[in-house]
Amino acid sequence: NHFGNSTYIFTPLYIANYCENYCVYCGFNCYNDIHRKQLSMEEIEHEMKVIADSGIEEILMLTGESKSKSSITYIGDACRLAKKYFRNVGLEIYPCNTKDYAYLHECGADYVTVFQETYNADKYETLHLMGHKRVFPYRFEAQERALMGGMRGVGFSALLGLSDFRKDALATALHVYYLQRKYPHAEMSLSC
């Protein structure tokens, strides 16, 4: 209904890169001494206008996983701006509860992508040493909460190579299959 036999090009836009997690493999983790930035609404709108002027009709807004630096209100305000410029607005942010996903959808978000990182719960625990991301089940259930909050679509992925890539690829497919059966109206996508 929304996409048909079409292909859309999207571009990512990091609106903030603060993180409160300690993931041993990630360059953005809270212990890495890198330049951190949270764009103002004026900066976000400027970037969106430049991107939209290039002809791109879909944007994926990303934040680091910091609820204190990238509040739901901040992300919602960015979604409202994005809807002025883009047909489709996606988010790749920290996992949220259903109420927050519903709010973001009301603000203009169409879909959410969540990287599970690995579906191997034991390996997951050894890679995520601190922060909200450490809670495996909460991350695993994020896509379903997004759909319950009204999102039109959800994206899935594992970071292949953190654990056995074959098992993670299969687990990702099974995760999609399960939610596709439960929410047949929803759009599902996979990232590599």
Label the predicted regions.
Residues Y8-E43:
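Canonical Radical SAM [4Fe-4S] cluster-binding loop centered on the CxxxCxxC motif
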Residues D33-H46, V135-Y138, A171:
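Glycine-rich anion/phosphate-binding loops
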